[in-house]
Amino acid sequence: MRAAAAGGGVRTAALALLLGALHWAPARCEEYDYYGWQAEPLHGRSYSKPPQCLDIPADLPLCHTVGYKRMRLPNLLEHESLAEVKQQASSWLPLLAKRCHSDTQVFLCSLFAPVCLDRPIYPCRSLCEAVRAGCAPLMEAYGFPWPEMLHCHKFPLDNDLCIAVQFGHLPATAPPVTKICAQCEMEHSADGLMEQMCSSDFVVKMRIKEIKIENGDRKLIGAQKKKKLLKPGPLKRKDTKRLVLHMKNGAGCPCPQLDSLAGSFLVMGRKVDGQLLLMAVYRWDKKNKEMKFAVKFMFSYPCSLYYPFFYGAAEPH
């Protein structure tokens, strides 16, 4: 029995059909013996409280608009309290905002805020694979692999009781447009800039001598002089002597900030396996009050306890 949405319906209607299909399923465990897939044991963890259902609160923005109102705890990621769910789920809001796949919210919320039924309903493997195909390249651009907790082999095949792809098969309403490189999408507020600085290992004001294309990436090669380390982080002397930043998957997408290399740039990045990965780049504008404020007060900003996937994922600081 596959949970699938009515093609071409609006988001709420599609999920209503999905949940309607699931609600009639019997709750007795023996009636599920037909389905060959079984959820992996959750690390042998025992829960202090029995499963409960509660309203999805407004301050859980990742899932508050997912299309159903009640969620089950513990969830499918072993979170037992709503406070823990809120903290961990907030890390994924930026990924949702990137719109890397139309089913990102459905997939994530099936784990963080599973629909309230008598038995946990997992996402289908095909749903996981579809979202991973759309979002993993974006995450990799920032040096984050697809996380272990979301490995698709953990989820059931589509012939089992599971949540299938909802919106990924809808026809496109407009011709595809080449997206700006993820690292070149700009924040315009001081808070947004400081969030980016929080999630970056280093922040540098620099000039760019040249850009090279290599294996699908762009390489930004810094000029020898005119570098100012605003947040040195893990950068060593050898890193700064010849500063080379890798823009992952950046060879085939536009980056308006880099159309001209004249002037200085504000760059942010992470050091991963000895390589400097670009996370964000801005043209330096001394008249930009938001940028000046962010640079001046970056160390006063209350950074999240968790690194994000470009400003949110459950990687400890």
Swiss-Prot record:
Q: Where is the FZ domain?
A: 48-165
Segment forming the signal sequence:
1-29
UniProtKB keywords: Developmental protein, Differentiation, Disulfide bond, Secreted, Signal, Wnt signaling pathway
Q: Where is the NTR domain?
A: 181-303
What's a single GO MF annotation on this record? Wnt-protein binding
Q: What is its main location?
A: secreted
Q: In which tissues is it expressed?
A: Highly expressed in the retinal pigment epithelium (RPE) and pancreas. Weak expression in heart, liver and muscle.
Alphabetical GO CC annotations of the entry are: extracellular space
Q: Where is this chain's protein located in or outside the cell? A: Secreted
**Keyword match Ion transport:** no
PROSITE patterns this protein is in? FZ (PS50038), NTR (PS50189)
Q: Name one Pfam family in it.
A: Fz
Q: Which SUPFAM superfamilies match?
A: Frizzled cysteine-rich domain, TIMP-like
Q: Which InterPro entries match?
A: Frizzled/SFRP, Frizzled_dom, Frizzled_dom_sf, Netrin_domain, Netrin_module_non-TIMP, SFRP5_CRD, TIMP-like_OB-fold
Please indicate if the UniProt record lists Secreted as a keyword. yes
Q: Which GO terms describe its biological process?
A: anatomical structure morphogenesis; apoptotic process; canonical Wnt signaling pathway; cell differentiation; digestive tract morphogenesis; establishment or maintenance of cell polarity; negative regulation of canonical Wnt signaling pathway; negative regulation of cell population proliferation
Q: List the disulfide bonds.
A: C53-C116, C63-C109, C100-C135, C124-C162, C128-C152, C181-C253, C184-C255, C198-C303
Q: What is known of its domains?
A: The FZ domain is involved in binding with Wnt ligands.
Any idea what job this protein has?
Soluble frizzled-related proteins (sFRPS) function as modulators of Wnt signaling through direct interaction with Wnts. They have a role in regulating cell growth and differentiation in specific cell types. SFRP5 may be involved in determining the polarity of photoreceptor, and perhaps, other cells in the retina.
The record's similarity note reads: Belongs to the secreted frizzled-related protein (sFRP) family.
Q: What is the protein name stated in its UniProt record?
A: Secreted frizzled-related protein 5
Q: Which organism is it from?
A: Homo sapiens (Human)
What is the taxonomic lineage of the source species? Eukaryota, Metazoa, Chordata, Craniata, Vertebrata
